[in-house]
């Protein structure tokens, strides 16, 4: 009679060990929710929607009596005064037509982005 009880206890102990060791793996592989662990659930943040509604709502909420920069939503007097979205990684160049472009510094030597912009202006690039 002791054998079935002992076997059940042994199986129960093994299931707890397997759940403790592999519970996180199974939760990640199969979407969580079930079994083992301490019942912890991770809450993931929502991605912004893939349509333009989020952007439009931010544009509509922006208050600007001058020019609202489309990429940074900064309020400036003239379009060529718009800042770059990532000023730590981009150089800003004002074009002759009163517009500006932002060029990634991405691994270029100092002044290399400016040289490439100048070559492009001349049609050599």
Curated annotation (Swiss-Prot):
Q: Where are the transmembrane segments?
A: none
Leader sequence range is 1-20
Keywords carried by this UniProt record: Signal
What are the coiled-coil residue ranges? none
Domain of life (superkingdom) = Eukaryota
Return the InterPro entries for the record: LCL2
Q: Which GO terms describe its biological process?
A: ERAD pathway
Q: Please give the function described in this protein's UniProt entry.
A: Probable component of the endoplasmic reticulum-associated degradation (ERAD) pathway.
Against PANTHER family, the record matches this protein to: LONG CHRONOLOGICAL LIFESPAN PROTEIN 2
Q: Name the family the entry cites.
A: Belongs to the LCL2 family.
Q: What is this protein called?
A: Long chronological lifespan protein 2
Lineage of the species this protein comes from: Eukaryota, Fungi, Dikarya, Ascomycota, Pezizomycotina
Q: Which gene encodes it?
A: LCL2
